[in-house]
Design a protein with these regions (language model features):
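PRPP-associated nucleotide enzymes
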Residues: 1-167
């Protein structure tokens, strides 16, 4: 059975932000965006909440293993420990699917001595490898393949884009 797919517009993303932002209370000392999916939602949250201390993390998992749960993460980019220590840090990604990436980042940020909270646009509890945990804040629960407006190529085979005609 083919997986359900949702192609979102910028209006959809704005509506998700309208649901997500009121959940977060108090000031954050830092915002850590997970590349690539967390860059745009992270920027939107930082702007809306006036967070100016913005960091990025990039994590890669080996694709060579057949059991993806056994893949060991490689940090391609991560802030120095001193930039996180004793701070309230909001970690942002677009989606919590398997949870591998964001959970890996959570562990490393906590090891630096930070207080961590997480925010995603979409949470997929049915796909999560971490059944006892999930994001602190999320805008929607889904089981669909989500295609965000900034992902013009991913998952779009055969899907017409609104307002565009083929050349």
């Amino acid at each position: 059975m083919p997986r359900r797919q949702e192609v979102l517009t910028w209006e959809d993303v704005n509506a998700l932000m309208d649901h997500l932002l009121p959940q977060m209370q108090g000031a954050f000392d830092a915002l850590l965006m997970i590349t690539r999916g967390g860059i745009i939602p992270g920027g939107m949250i930082a702007e809306a909440m006036d967070i100016t201390y913005i960091l990025t993390a990039a994590v890669r998992f080996s694709t060579e293993l057949t059991d993806k749960r056994l893949a060991w993460p490689t940090f391609l980019q991560f802030p120095e420990d001193s930039l996180l220590k004793d701070r309230r840090v909001l970690i942002v990604d677009d989606i919590w699917g398997s949870g591998r990436t964001i959970t890996t980042v959570i562990g490393r940020v906590e090891a630096c001595g930070a207080r961590v909270e997480t925010a995603v646009l979409h949470y997929k509890p049915g796909s999560s490898l971490f059944k006892q945990s999930g994001p602190t804040y999320y805008a929607a629960i889904t089981d669909a393949l989500i295609v965000y407006p900034w992902e013009t190529g991913r998952g779009m085979q055969g899907v017409p884009l609104p307002g565009l005609t083929p050349i």
